[in-house]
Each structure stands twice: as C-alpha cells, then as structure tokens.
Amino acid sequence: MRRHLVTGSSSGIGAATCRLLAGPGSAFVVHARSNAEGAERVAAELRARGAQAVVAMGDLAQPGTAEALVATAVERFGGLDVLVANAGYADRTGLDDLTPERFEESLRVIGTGFLRLARAARAPLAAGSDPRVVAVGSFVAHSFRTDAPVFLASAAAKGGLEGMVRALAIELAPQRITVNCVVPGAIAKDAGTVSAMTPEQWRASLARIPLGRVGKPEEVAAAIGFLCSPPAAYVTGQALHVNGGLVI
C-alpha cells in the first residue's frame, strides 16, 4: 500500500493530486483547514477509485497540526510514503498595509508549516517505500513586474520554501527521501473557492502567458505525480515550473 499525506487537498491542486494518485492499494490523508465538506467529497471520490481515505482538519499555522496529520497517516495506514505539502494561500497586501503579524502568518503557514511537516514525517518516510516529499511553490516568488500584482508576503514565504526544499534534499538523501518543489503559474480555481486575483487581473494575466491560457489543477497534479513516481527516483532538490511560459 502506498500511503499519502496531501495538505490543502479539499480543492484545486491538492484535490487533483489525490485523484491522480488514487487507486487500489493507495491510502490518503485528505487535509483541509476549514473546508470539511470539500475534504469529505474528495475522500469519497478516492474511495470510489479503490483507495482508502481519511479526512483530517487543522490549521498548519498552529503548533501540533503538522504532527497530528503525520500521526493520522501512521495510525490509520501504518506509515507514510508520500508527503505533498500543498497547503497555503496567496496574500497580495502591499507594503503600507502589510503588518509584521500578517507577514509572519504567511511564513507560519507556508514555511514553518512545511518545517513541522518535514520534521514529523522524516522517520515514517525513512521507514516507508520509495519515499517522496513534494512541496508546492508559486510563480509569485519568481515573477515581479510593474504590470502585474505583487505578492510581497507570499513571495517571501514561497521563496523560502524553495530554499528549504534544496536544503532538505541534501539532509534527507541518506534516508533515500527525495525532496522537490512544483511551482505553479496562474492556475484556474475550483468553482466556489476564493482567488487572490480579481477577474480583471486574471484576464490581464493571459497576455503575459506565452501559451495564452491559465493552467488546470490537473496539469500541476501531473507534475507532482511524476515526482512521486518510480521514474523520478533520481530527481531531488529541483523546482519544476508549470506555468505556460509565464516564468522562463
């Protein structure tokens, strides 16, 4: 059985990743901070595909949440083989309105949350089969333009996340754990979910994307799925961009 913990998996990229990886012989901890209905819906879809699935709620900005999520995988499925750190949010608050507290919130959810997940997951991953860690970054840490929204706090948090991925790839290599990052560009949101950009900003973004469209969650999930697959066993410490050419 291949056992997965996918954070932020009640919708969007996280949900698409679970669907892609699900099948007989797989098991999932489906995580959400507040969207319990979405998480339960995803879990039901995974079970329909022959997978085992359990829902776990929690705010990764809070101490103890990451550890509890990993413990759920170990207790329910006997261990952990794949960690996908997808939870996070975009904050485009400008400098004048960005308080230190709000800035630190982005760092807690994205950076400190990933640190806690990695620390808690290290031992069960090392004992697992073909262990993988994939973090989900963002183009906002790479694309800075005067004609596009700037995400100051998110850029800092996601840029730091990529640095952590590279450092952990070195530290966890002796345990055969690969650590990589998938960096999405502008990706369509599921209906009913909140976007950090207005409809006008979404339309304007198309002009900056060489392929002329926003991406689909399933396209990002495909990159994550590759990094979790046997052919990616020799890939570690890398950032794989999925952005239609937005960042080249």
Language-model features, listed with the residues they occupy:
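Conserved glycine-rich cofactor-binding loop
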Residues: 10-11
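Conserved glycine-rich Rossmann-like NAD(P)H-binding loop of the short-chain dehydrogenase/reductase
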Residues: 24-40
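Substrate-binding pocket helix/loop in short-chain dehydrogenase/reductase
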Residues: 94-95, 99-107, 193, 201-205
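Alpha-helical segment proximal to the catalytic Tyr-Lys
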Residues: 123, 170-171, 233
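Short, small/polar-rich loop/turn modules that mediate ligand/substrate recognition or access, typified
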Residues: 130, 173, 178, 235-237
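Catalytic loop of short-chain dehydrogenase/reductase
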Residues: 134-160, 165-174, 186-187
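Short C-terminal tail/terminal secondary-structure segment
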Residues: 225, 236-248
